[in-house]
Design a protein with these regions (language model features):
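Active-site-proximal region of nucleotide-activated glycan assembly enzymes
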Residues: 129-139, 288-346
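Conserved catalytic-core segment of nucleotide-activated headgroup transferases in glycan assembly
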Residues: 182-191, 316, 327-410, 419
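Catalytic binding pocket for nucleotide-activated donors in carbohydrate/polymer assembly enzymes
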Residues: 439-508
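Acidic donor-binding loop of glycosyltransferase active sites
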Residues: 267-271, 431-444, 456
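A charged, aromatic-enriched C-terminal amphipathic alpha-helix characteristic of glycosyltransferases
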Residues: 349, 491-527
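Conserved active-site histidine-acidic residue motif and adjacent donor-binding/catalytic loop
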Residues: 251-254, 401-403, 417-430, 444
Length: 533
Protein backbone atom coordinates (compact mmCIF):
# COMPACT_ATOMS: atom_id res chain seq x y z
CA UNK A 1 0.00 0.00 0.00
CA UNK A 2 2.83 2.39 0.92
CA UNK A 3 4.66 1.57 -2.32
CA UNK A 4 1.53 2.34 -4.36
CA UNK A 5 1.03 5.62 -2.49
CA UNK A 6 4.66 6.53 -3.09
CA UNK A 7 4.31 5.83 -6.82
CA UNK A 8 1.15 7.95 -7.05
CA UNK A 9 2.81 10.83 -5.21
CA UNK A 10 5.79 10.56 -7.55
CA UNK A 11 3.48 10.76 -10.58
CA UNK A 12 1.62 13.75 -9.14
CA UNK A 13 4.87 15.53 -8.35
CA UNK A 14 6.20 14.83 -11.84
CA UNK A 15 2.97 16.16 -13.37
CA UNK A 16 3.14 19.28 -11.18
CA UNK A 17 6.73 19.86 -12.31
CA UNK A 18 5.75 19.52 -15.95
CA UNK A 19 2.87 21.96 -15.60
CA UNK A 20 5.40 24.62 -14.63
CA UNK A 21 7.74 24.00 -17.56
CA UNK A 22 9.31 26.87 -19.42
CA UNK A 23 9.59 26.53 -23.23
CA UNK A 24 13.26 25.56 -22.84
CA UNK A 25 12.45 22.90 -20.24
CA UNK A 26 9.66 21.61 -22.47
CA UNK A 27 12.03 21.25 -25.41
CA UNK A 28 14.68 19.62 -23.21
CA UNK A 29 12.16 17.00 -22.09
CA UNK A 30 11.06 16.38 -25.68
CA UNK A 31 14.69 15.78 -26.66
CA UNK A 32 15.23 13.41 -23.71
CA UNK A 33 12.13 11.42 -24.64
CA UNK A 34 13.23 11.38 -28.26
CA UNK A 35 16.63 10.00 -27.27
CA UNK A 36 15.03 7.41 -25.04
CA UNK A 37 12.82 6.37 -27.91
CA UNK A 38 15.98 5.74 -29.93
CA UNK A 39 17.51 3.77 -27.03
CA UNK A 40 20.53 6.06 -27.17
CA UNK A 41 20.53 6.86 -23.48
CA UNK A 42 18.94 5.66 -20.28
CA UNK A 43 16.44 7.98 -18.61
CA UNK A 44 14.62 7.10 -15.36
CA UNK A 45 11.14 5.99 -16.29
CA UNK A 46 9.12 7.66 -13.53
CA UNK A 47 6.23 8.23 -15.92
CA UNK A 48 5.31 5.98 -18.89
CA UNK A 49 6.57 7.61 -22.06
CA UNK A 50 3.12 7.73 -23.69
CA UNK A 51 1.73 9.53 -20.62
CA UNK A 52 4.61 11.99 -20.66
CA UNK A 53 3.96 12.72 -24.33
CA UNK A 54 0.30 13.41 -23.65
CA UNK A 55 1.31 15.84 -20.91
CA UNK A 56 3.84 17.50 -23.18
CA UNK A 57 1.14 17.93 -25.81
CA UNK A 58 -1.14 19.57 -23.26
CA UNK A 59 1.62 21.83 -21.94
CA UNK A 60 2.49 23.04 -25.43
CA UNK A 61 -1.15 23.80 -26.20
CA UNK A 62 -1.32 25.92 -23.03
CA UNK A 63 1.79 27.95 -23.80
CA UNK A 64 1.21 31.50 -24.97
CA UNK A 65 1.69 32.28 -28.64
CA UNK A 66 4.99 33.98 -27.80
CA UNK A 67 6.21 30.89 -25.91
CA UNK A 68 5.23 28.59 -28.79
CA UNK A 69 7.01 30.86 -31.26
CA UNK A 70 10.12 30.74 -29.08
CA UNK A 71 10.14 26.93 -29.31
CA UNK A 72 9.89 27.21 -33.10
CA UNK A 73 12.75 29.73 -33.05
CA UNK A 74 14.97 27.40 -31.00
CA UNK A 75 14.37 24.43 -33.28
CA UNK A 76 14.90 26.57 -36.36
CA UNK A 77 18.14 28.18 -35.26
CA UNK A 78 19.86 26.13 -32.56
CA UNK A 79 20.10 22.70 -34.18
CA UNK A 80 21.70 21.16 -37.23
CA UNK A 81 19.20 20.10 -39.88
CA UNK A 82 19.49 16.37 -39.08
CA UNK A 83 18.94 16.92 -35.36
CA UNK A 84 16.09 19.38 -35.91
CA UNK A 85 14.26 16.93 -38.18
CA UNK A 86 14.56 14.14 -35.62
CA UNK A 87 13.13 16.39 -32.90
CA UNK A 88 10.36 17.65 -35.18
CA UNK A 89 9.39 14.13 -36.24
CA UNK A 90 9.06 13.18 -32.58
CA UNK A 91 6.90 16.24 -31.84
CA UNK A 92 4.65 15.50 -34.82
CA UNK A 93 4.44 11.70 -34.69
CA UNK A 94 4.51 11.07 -30.92
CA UNK A 95 3.24 14.25 -29.29
CA UNK A 96 0.69 14.85 -32.08
CA UNK A 97 1.31 18.59 -31.91
CA UNK A 98 0.29 20.47 -35.05
CA UNK A 99 1.85 23.61 -36.48
CA UNK A 100 5.43 22.38 -37.04
CA UNK A 101 4.97 21.49 -40.72
CA UNK A 102 6.68 24.64 -41.98
CA UNK A 103 9.66 23.98 -39.71
CA UNK A 104 10.07 20.51 -41.21
CA UNK A 105 9.86 21.86 -44.75
CA UNK A 106 12.49 24.52 -44.06
CA UNK A 107 14.97 21.99 -42.67
CA UNK A 108 14.29 19.54 -45.50
CA UNK A 109 14.87 22.23 -48.11
CA UNK A 110 17.99 23.70 -46.50
CA UNK A 111 19.57 20.43 -45.39
CA UNK A 112 22.10 18.36 -47.32
CA UNK A 113 20.93 14.76 -47.74
CA UNK A 114 21.53 12.00 -50.26
CA UNK A 115 18.96 11.63 -53.05
CA UNK A 116 17.01 8.77 -51.54
CA UNK A 117 16.74 10.36 -48.09
CA UNK A 118 15.62 13.60 -49.75
CA UNK A 119 12.88 11.72 -51.61
CA UNK A 120 11.67 10.08 -48.40
CA UNK A 121 11.74 13.37 -46.49
CA UNK A 122 9.56 14.91 -49.19
CA UNK A 123 7.26 11.91 -48.79
CA UNK A 124 6.97 12.56 -45.04
CA UNK A 125 5.80 16.10 -45.81
CA UNK A 126 3.15 14.78 -48.20
CA UNK A 127 1.76 12.53 -45.46
CA UNK A 128 1.50 15.25 -42.82
CA UNK A 129 -2.03 16.20 -41.75
CA UNK A 130 -1.34 19.73 -42.95
CA UNK A 131 0.96 19.73 -45.95
CA UNK A 132 3.30 22.77 -46.00
CA UNK A 133 2.55 25.58 -48.46
CA UNK A 134 2.49 24.56 -52.12
CA UNK A 135 5.33 26.89 -53.14
CA UNK A 136 7.65 25.35 -50.52
CA UNK A 137 6.76 21.83 -51.64
CA UNK A 138 7.51 22.74 -55.25
CA UNK A 139 10.94 24.08 -54.23
CA UNK A 140 11.74 20.85 -52.37
CA UNK A 141 10.56 18.77 -55.32
CA UNK A 142 12.74 20.73 -57.78
CA UNK A 143 15.72 20.31 -55.47
CA UNK A 144 15.17 16.55 -55.42
CA UNK A 145 14.97 16.38 -59.21
CA UNK A 146 18.25 18.31 -59.47
CA UNK A 147 19.85 15.87 -57.02
CA UNK A 148 18.72 12.88 -59.08
CA UNK A 149 19.96 14.38 -62.33
CA UNK A 150 23.33 15.27 -60.83
CA UNK A 151 23.85 11.81 -59.34
CA UNK A 152 22.50 9.66 -62.18
CA UNK A 153 24.05 11.61 -65.04
CA UNK A 154 20.80 11.23 -67.02
CA UNK A 155 20.89 13.44 -70.11
CA UNK A 156 18.89 12.90 -73.28
CA UNK A 157 18.05 15.32 -76.08
CA UNK A 158 14.43 16.40 -76.37
CA UNK A 159 12.38 14.29 -78.81
CA UNK A 160 10.12 16.40 -81.07
CA UNK A 161 6.49 15.35 -81.28
CA UNK A 162 6.79 14.30 -84.93
CA UNK A 163 9.48 11.75 -84.02
CA UNK A 164 7.57 10.01 -81.22
CA UNK A 165 5.70 6.72 -81.33
CA UNK A 166 2.09 7.87 -81.59
CA UNK A 167 0.81 4.44 -80.52
CA UNK A 168 2.75 4.21 -77.26
CA UNK A 169 1.91 5.62 -73.81
CA UNK A 170 4.02 4.99 -70.73
CA UNK A 171 2.31 5.06 -67.34
CA UNK A 172 4.27 5.78 -64.16
CA UNK A 173 2.58 5.18 -60.82
CA UNK A 174 3.55 4.82 -57.17
CA UNK A 175 2.12 1.38 -56.40
CA UNK A 176 0.81 -1.77 -58.05
CA UNK A 177 -0.41 -4.31 -55.53
CA UNK A 178 -1.79 -7.80 -56.04
CA UNK A 179 -4.96 -6.70 -54.25
CA UNK A 180 -7.02 -5.00 -56.95
CA UNK A 181 -9.34 -3.62 -54.27
CA UNK A 182 -6.46 -1.24 -53.55
CA UNK A 183 -7.80 1.98 -55.08
CA UNK A 184 -4.60 3.35 -56.72
CA UNK A 185 -3.84 -0.09 -58.18
CA UNK A 186 -7.35 -0.47 -59.57
CA UNK A 187 -7.29 3.05 -61.00
CA UNK A 188 -3.99 2.43 -62.80
CA UNK A 189 -5.03 -0.95 -64.17
CA UNK A 190 -8.42 0.32 -65.34
CA UNK A 191 -6.80 3.30 -67.08
CA UNK A 192 -4.16 1.14 -68.74
CA UNK A 193 -6.77 -1.41 -69.81
CA UNK A 194 -9.12 1.22 -71.28
CA UNK A 195 -6.33 3.03 -73.12
CA UNK A 196 -5.29 -0.27 -74.67
CA UNK A 197 -8.71 -1.80 -75.41
CA UNK A 198 -10.76 1.22 -76.43
CA UNK A 199 -8.10 3.62 -77.75
CA UNK A 200 -5.60 1.09 -79.20
CA UNK A 201 -2.48 2.31 -77.39
CA UNK A 202 0.43 0.07 -76.46
CA UNK A 203 0.90 0.55 -72.72
CA UNK A 204 3.95 0.03 -70.53
CA UNK A 205 3.68 0.58 -66.76
CA UNK A 206 6.49 1.55 -64.38
CA UNK A 207 6.32 1.98 -60.61
CA UNK A 208 8.67 3.94 -58.35
CA UNK A 209 7.29 3.56 -54.83
CA UNK A 210 8.85 5.79 -52.17
CA UNK A 211 9.16 3.08 -49.54
CA UNK A 212 12.66 3.30 -48.05
CA UNK A 213 12.99 3.67 -44.27
CA UNK A 214 14.70 6.87 -43.20
CA UNK A 215 17.61 6.49 -40.75
CA UNK A 216 16.41 6.55 -37.14
CA UNK A 217 18.84 9.39 -36.41
CA UNK A 218 17.00 11.52 -38.98
CA UNK A 219 13.27 10.74 -38.63
CA UNK A 220 10.97 8.88 -36.24
CA UNK A 221 8.28 6.65 -37.76
CA UNK A 222 8.87 6.76 -41.52
CA UNK A 223 5.72 6.71 -43.63
CA UNK A 224 5.93 5.34 -47.17
CA UNK A 225 4.17 3.45 -49.94
CA UNK A 226 4.00 -0.34 -49.81
CA UNK A 227 5.52 -2.11 -52.80
CA UNK A 228 6.80 -5.45 -53.98
CA UNK A 229 10.42 -6.04 -54.98
CA UNK A 230 12.10 -4.78 -58.13
CA UNK A 231 10.98 -7.08 -60.94
CA UNK A 232 9.00 -7.40 -64.15
CA UNK A 233 5.30 -8.23 -63.96
CA UNK A 234 2.73 -9.48 -66.40
CA UNK A 235 -0.64 -8.62 -64.94
CA UNK A 236 -3.76 -10.39 -66.16
CA UNK A 237 -6.57 -7.85 -65.97
CA UNK A 238 -9.95 -8.65 -67.48
CA UNK A 239 -9.17 -9.95 -70.99
CA UNK A 240 -5.75 -8.27 -71.31
CA UNK A 241 -2.19 -8.81 -70.11
CA UNK A 242 -0.45 -5.62 -68.96
CA UNK A 243 3.34 -5.26 -68.72
CA UNK A 244 4.85 -3.55 -65.68
CA UNK A 245 8.29 -3.05 -64.15
CA UNK A 246 8.64 -2.14 -60.48
CA UNK A 247 11.43 0.09 -59.17
CA UNK A 248 10.74 0.51 -55.43
CA UNK A 249 13.11 2.87 -53.66
CA UNK A 250 14.17 0.37 -50.99
CA UNK A 251 15.29 -2.20 -53.58
CA UNK A 252 16.74 0.10 -56.25
CA UNK A 253 19.93 2.04 -56.87
CA UNK A 254 20.71 5.17 -58.84
CA UNK A 255 21.86 2.86 -61.63
CA UNK A 256 18.44 1.17 -61.59
CA UNK A 257 16.71 4.51 -62.05
CA UNK A 258 19.11 5.42 -64.85
CA UNK A 259 18.09 2.12 -66.46
CA UNK A 260 14.38 2.90 -65.95
CA UNK A 261 14.59 6.35 -67.54
CA UNK A 262 16.73 5.02 -70.39
CA UNK A 263 14.16 2.31 -71.06
CA UNK A 264 11.36 4.88 -71.19
CA UNK A 265 13.46 7.01 -73.55
CA UNK A 266 13.97 4.04 -75.86
CA UNK A 267 10.23 3.28 -75.86
CA UNK A 268 9.78 6.82 -77.24
CA UNK A 269 6.14 7.24 -76.12
CA UNK A 270 3.75 9.91 -77.32
CA UNK A 271 3.73 11.04 -73.69
CA UNK A 272 4.29 9.74 -70.17
CA UNK A 273 1.20 9.61 -67.96
CA UNK A 274 1.95 9.93 -64.26
CA UNK A 275 -0.98 8.51 -62.28
CA UNK A 276 -0.61 9.66 -58.69
CA UNK A 277 3.15 9.16 -58.33
CA UNK A 278 4.62 11.66 -55.87
CA UNK A 279 8.23 10.65 -56.44
CA UNK A 280 10.47 13.11 -58.33
CA UNK A 281 11.69 10.09 -60.29
CA UNK A 282 8.40 10.18 -62.20
CA UNK A 283 9.27 13.66 -63.50
CA UNK A 284 12.65 12.75 -65.01
CA UNK A 285 11.26 11.83 -68.48
CA UNK A 286 10.37 15.53 -68.82
CA UNK A 287 13.94 15.93 -70.08
CA UNK A 288 13.09 14.34 -73.41
CA UNK A 289 9.31 14.00 -73.76
CA UNK A 290 5.99 15.33 -72.51
CA UNK A 291 4.95 14.27 -69.02
CA UNK A 292 1.25 14.46 -68.14
CA UNK A 293 0.41 14.36 -64.43
CA UNK A 294 -2.97 13.04 -63.32
CA UNK A 295 -2.69 13.54 -59.58
CA UNK A 296 -5.87 11.59 -58.63
CA UNK A 297 -6.58 14.08 -55.81
CA UNK A 298 -8.20 17.51 -55.94
CA UNK A 299 -5.09 19.57 -55.23
CA UNK A 300 -2.58 20.55 -57.89
CA UNK A 301 0.30 18.08 -58.16
CA UNK A 302 3.75 18.76 -56.75
CA UNK A 303 5.43 18.07 -60.05
CA UNK A 304 7.53 19.38 -62.92
CA UNK A 305 5.29 17.60 -65.45
CA UNK A 306 4.36 19.58 -68.56
CA UNK A 307 0.60 19.12 -68.29
CA UNK A 308 -1.50 18.84 -65.13
CA UNK A 309 -4.81 16.97 -65.48
CA UNK A 310 -7.26 18.19 -62.85
CA UNK A 311 -10.93 17.48 -62.33
CA UNK A 312 -12.03 20.34 -60.11
CA UNK A 313 -11.03 23.86 -59.12
CA UNK A 314 -10.62 24.82 -55.48
CA UNK A 315 -11.06 28.26 -53.92
CA UNK A 316 -9.67 31.26 -55.81
CA UNK A 317 -6.81 31.98 -53.40
CA UNK A 318 -5.48 28.44 -53.71
CA UNK A 319 -5.90 28.35 -57.48
CA UNK A 320 -4.02 31.66 -57.80
CA UNK A 321 -1.17 30.17 -55.76
CA UNK A 322 -1.08 27.15 -58.08
CA UNK A 323 -0.91 29.43 -61.13
CA UNK A 324 1.95 31.44 -59.63
CA UNK A 325 4.00 28.28 -59.18
CA UNK A 326 3.54 26.97 -62.73
CA UNK A 327 6.84 26.88 -64.59
CA UNK A 328 7.03 28.36 -68.07
CA UNK A 329 6.64 24.91 -69.67
CA UNK A 330 3.60 23.93 -67.58
CA UNK A 331 -0.14 24.21 -68.11
CA UNK A 332 -3.25 22.92 -66.38
CA UNK A 333 -6.15 21.12 -68.07
CA UNK A 334 -9.50 20.78 -66.34
CA UNK A 335 -11.65 17.78 -67.28
CA UNK A 336 -15.41 18.18 -67.11
CA UNK A 337 -15.96 14.45 -66.66
CA UNK A 338 -15.32 12.97 -63.22
CA UNK A 339 -12.99 10.00 -63.13
CA UNK A 340 -15.41 7.23 -62.13
CA UNK A 341 -14.75 5.40 -58.91
CA UNK A 342 -14.42 1.86 -60.26
CA UNK A 343 -15.05 -0.85 -57.69
CA UNK A 344 -14.85 -4.60 -57.84
CA UNK A 345 -18.43 -5.80 -57.42
CA UNK A 346 -18.73 -8.15 -54.47
CA UNK A 347 -21.69 -10.31 -53.59
CA UNK A 348 -20.11 -11.34 -50.32
CA UNK A 349 -22.09 -10.47 -47.22
CA UNK A 350 -21.26 -10.45 -43.54
CA UNK A 351 -23.29 -10.30 -40.36
CA UNK A 352 -22.45 -8.09 -37.45
CA UNK A 353 -22.05 -11.19 -35.33
CA UNK A 354 -19.36 -12.51 -37.70
CA UNK A 355 -17.51 -9.21 -37.36
CA UNK A 356 -17.97 -9.03 -33.56
CA UNK A 357 -19.96 -5.83 -33.92
CA UNK A 358 -22.93 -4.86 -31.72
CA UNK A 359 -26.34 -5.58 -33.21
CA UNK A 360 -28.16 -2.68 -31.58
CA UNK A 361 -25.86 0.24 -32.40
CA UNK A 362 -25.75 2.87 -35.15
CA UNK A 363 -22.30 2.12 -36.59
CA UNK A 364 -20.16 4.87 -38.12
CA UNK A 365 -16.97 3.86 -39.92
CA UNK A 366 -13.60 5.56 -40.30
CA UNK A 367 -11.68 4.05 -43.21
CA UNK A 368 -8.07 4.38 -44.32
CA UNK A 369 -4.55 3.03 -44.27
CA UNK A 370 -3.08 6.11 -42.53
CA UNK A 371 -5.66 6.90 -39.87
CA UNK A 372 -2.98 7.15 -37.17
CA UNK A 373 -1.81 10.36 -38.81
CA UNK A 374 -5.00 11.46 -40.59
CA UNK A 375 -7.21 11.59 -37.50
CA UNK A 376 -6.07 14.81 -35.84
CA UNK A 377 -6.39 15.56 -32.10
CA UNK A 378 -9.35 17.86 -32.80
CA UNK A 379 -11.10 15.14 -34.82
CA UNK A 380 -10.55 12.68 -31.99
CA UNK A 381 -12.34 15.14 -29.73
CA UNK A 382 -15.15 15.33 -32.28
CA UNK A 383 -15.53 11.53 -32.15
CA UNK A 384 -15.70 11.63 -28.35
CA UNK A 385 -18.29 14.42 -28.51
CA UNK A 386 -20.51 12.32 -30.79
CA UNK A 387 -20.21 9.31 -28.50
CA UNK A 388 -21.04 11.46 -25.48
CA UNK A 389 -24.09 13.02 -27.15
CA UNK A 390 -25.68 9.78 -28.39
CA UNK A 391 -25.27 6.48 -26.56
CA UNK A 392 -26.68 4.48 -29.50
CA UNK A 393 -23.70 5.36 -31.72
CA UNK A 394 -20.50 3.29 -31.95
CA UNK A 395 -17.53 3.73 -34.27
CA UNK A 396 -15.87 1.10 -36.46
CA UNK A 397 -12.27 1.65 -37.58
CA UNK A 398 -11.31 -0.07 -40.85
CA UNK A 399 -7.58 -0.10 -41.56
CA UNK A 400 -4.44 -0.90 -39.61
CA UNK A 401 -4.03 1.46 -36.65
CA UNK A 402 -1.81 1.47 -33.59
CA UNK A 403 -1.53 4.90 -32.00
CA UNK A 404 -5.19 5.76 -32.64
CA UNK A 405 -6.31 2.59 -30.87
CA UNK A 406 -3.96 3.28 -27.97
CA UNK A 407 -5.43 6.77 -27.66
CA UNK A 408 -9.06 5.64 -27.45
CA UNK A 409 -8.20 2.73 -25.15
CA UNK A 410 -7.30 5.39 -22.57
CA UNK A 411 -10.73 7.07 -22.79
CA UNK A 412 -14.15 6.25 -21.39
CA UNK A 413 -15.24 5.21 -24.89
CA UNK A 414 -12.87 2.26 -25.33
CA UNK A 415 -15.75 -0.24 -25.53
CA UNK A 416 -17.62 1.79 -28.17
CA UNK A 417 -14.90 1.83 -30.80
CA UNK A 418 -14.34 -1.40 -32.75
CA UNK A 419 -11.32 -2.27 -34.89
CA UNK A 420 -11.61 -4.48 -37.96
CA UNK A 421 -8.07 -3.96 -39.28
CA UNK A 422 -7.40 -4.10 -43.00
CA UNK A 423 -10.46 -5.34 -44.93
CA UNK A 424 -10.01 -6.31 -48.61
CA UNK A 425 -13.77 -6.56 -49.17
CA UNK A 426 -14.97 -3.09 -48.22
CA UNK A 427 -18.29 -3.43 -50.02
CA UNK A 428 -19.27 -6.49 -48.02
CA UNK A 429 -18.23 -4.86 -44.73
CA UNK A 430 -20.07 -1.63 -45.52
CA UNK A 431 -23.36 -3.49 -45.87
CA UNK A 432 -23.31 -4.13 -42.11
CA UNK A 433 -22.72 -0.46 -41.19
CA UNK A 434 -24.77 2.75 -41.15
CA UNK A 435 -22.58 5.74 -42.01
CA UNK A 436 -19.18 6.72 -43.47
CA UNK A 437 -17.40 9.62 -41.73
CA UNK A 438 -14.43 11.31 -43.37
CA UNK A 439 -11.75 13.13 -41.35
CA UNK A 440 -10.15 16.22 -42.86
CA UNK A 441 -7.45 14.74 -45.12
CA UNK A 442 -6.16 14.20 -48.63
CA UNK A 443 -7.31 10.87 -50.06
CA UNK A 444 -10.14 8.54 -49.12
CA UNK A 445 -12.12 9.22 -52.29
CA UNK A 446 -12.24 5.62 -53.44
CA UNK A 447 -13.37 4.15 -50.12
CA UNK A 448 -16.16 6.74 -49.91
CA UNK A 449 -17.33 5.90 -53.44
CA UNK A 450 -17.55 2.23 -52.47
CA UNK A 451 -19.60 3.29 -49.44
CA UNK A 452 -22.17 4.95 -51.71
CA UNK A 453 -22.39 1.76 -53.76
CA UNK A 454 -23.36 -0.05 -50.54
CA UNK A 455 -26.00 2.61 -49.84
CA UNK A 456 -23.94 4.04 -47.00
CA UNK A 457 -24.38 7.82 -46.65
CA UNK A 458 -21.18 9.84 -46.31
CA UNK A 459 -20.44 12.85 -44.10
CA UNK A 460 -17.46 14.96 -45.19
CA UNK A 461 -16.15 18.50 -45.21
CA UNK A 462 -15.92 20.23 -48.63
CA UNK A 463 -12.80 20.78 -50.77
CA UNK A 464 -11.30 17.32 -50.38
CA UNK A 465 -11.04 14.10 -52.38
CA UNK A 466 -14.01 12.49 -50.66
CA UNK A 467 -16.22 15.52 -51.37
CA UNK A 468 -15.16 15.34 -55.03
CA UNK A 469 -16.25 11.70 -55.23
CA UNK A 470 -19.57 11.92 -53.39
CA UNK A 471 -21.07 15.27 -54.53
CA UNK A 472 -22.44 18.16 -52.48
CA UNK A 473 -25.30 15.99 -51.25
CA UNK A 474 -23.06 14.53 -48.56
CA UNK A 475 -20.89 17.52 -47.59
CA UNK A 476 -21.16 19.74 -44.52
CA UNK A 477 -19.62 23.17 -44.03
CA UNK A 478 -17.80 22.69 -40.71
CA UNK A 479 -17.28 20.28 -37.82
CA UNK A 480 -20.21 21.70 -35.85
CA UNK A 481 -22.57 20.90 -38.72
CA UNK A 482 -20.85 17.53 -39.07
CA UNK A 483 -21.86 16.63 -35.51
CA UNK A 484 -25.42 17.88 -36.02
CA UNK A 485 -25.79 15.90 -39.25
CA UNK A 486 -24.46 12.69 -37.73
CA UNK A 487 -26.86 12.98 -34.80
CA UNK A 488 -29.72 13.50 -37.25
CA UNK A 489 -28.71 10.40 -39.23
CA UNK A 490 -28.76 8.35 -36.02
CA UNK A 491 -32.13 9.62 -34.77
CA UNK A 492 -34.22 10.43 -37.88
CA UNK A 493 -35.11 7.31 -39.91
CA UNK A 494 -36.87 9.27 -42.65
CA UNK A 495 -33.83 11.48 -43.15
CA UNK A 496 -31.53 8.45 -43.12
CA UNK A 497 -33.59 6.48 -45.64
CA UNK A 498 -33.70 9.47 -48.01
CA UNK A 499 -29.91 9.80 -47.93
CA UNK A 500 -29.48 6.04 -48.23
CA UNK A 501 -31.44 6.10 -51.49
CA UNK A 502 -29.51 9.15 -52.73
CA UNK A 503 -26.28 7.23 -52.11
CA UNK A 504 -27.48 4.29 -54.19
CA UNK A 505 -28.74 6.58 -56.96
CA UNK A 506 -25.47 8.50 -57.17
CA UNK A 507 -23.41 5.30 -57.27
CA UNK A 508 -25.54 3.85 -60.06
CA UNK A 509 -24.79 6.91 -62.22
CA UNK A 510 -21.07 6.39 -61.73
CA UNK A 511 -20.67 3.17 -63.71
CA UNK A 512 -17.47 1.70 -65.09
CA UNK A 513 -18.04 2.67 -68.72
CA UNK A 514 -17.77 6.33 -67.77
CA UNK A 515 -14.01 5.89 -67.78
CA UNK A 516 -14.17 5.85 -71.59
CA UNK A 517 -15.79 9.29 -71.59
CA UNK A 518 -13.21 10.59 -69.14
CA UNK A 519 -10.23 9.26 -71.10
CA UNK A 520 -11.68 10.45 -74.39
CA UNK A 521 -11.89 14.02 -73.07
CA UNK A 522 -8.46 13.74 -71.46
CA UNK A 523 -6.78 12.47 -74.64
CA UNK A 524 -8.42 15.16 -76.77
CA UNK A 525 -7.25 17.94 -74.46
CA UNK A 526 -3.76 16.48 -73.98
CA UNK A 527 -3.23 16.19 -77.74
CA UNK A 528 -4.32 19.82 -78.14
CA UNK A 529 -1.78 20.81 -75.49
CA UNK A 530 1.15 18.77 -76.83
CA UNK A 531 3.99 20.94 -78.14
CA UNK A 532 3.79 21.91 -81.79
CA UNK A 533 7.44 21.25 -82.60
Amino acid sequence: MLNLLSQNLSLLYKEFQMLNYTPVEWLQTVIKNCMKNLHLTEIPNHVPLSDTNAQLHSIYENFTTAEQQYIHHLIQNQFKHNDALLILSYIINYLKVEGFEQDVADHVYNGDFDCFNQIMLETQLIFLNKVPPYNIMRKIHRKNISCLLANTGISFPYIPLKDRNNNKIVIITEQLLQNTNHAPTLMTLETAYALHKYFNYDIEIFTCASNRLLPTYLWSLTTGFYSYDHHHLQISYKDAVLNAIQYPLDASTLNDYREMITYIHDLNPLFVLNIGANSPIADLPHLFTTVVNFNTVTTAPISEADIFIRCTKLDNALENLYKQELSSHQQQIFIKQNFPAITNISNKSFTRKELNLPEDKFLICLVGNRLDTEVSPSFRQLICSILRLNSTIDFVVIGTVHELKEHFENTNYRDRIHYLGYCPDLLGIYRTLNLYLNPERIGGGWSSAIALRAGLPVVTLPNCDVAYNVSETFTVTNEEQMIETILQYASDKVFYNTKHQQALDFASQNEENKIIDFLSEMLTKVKEALPND
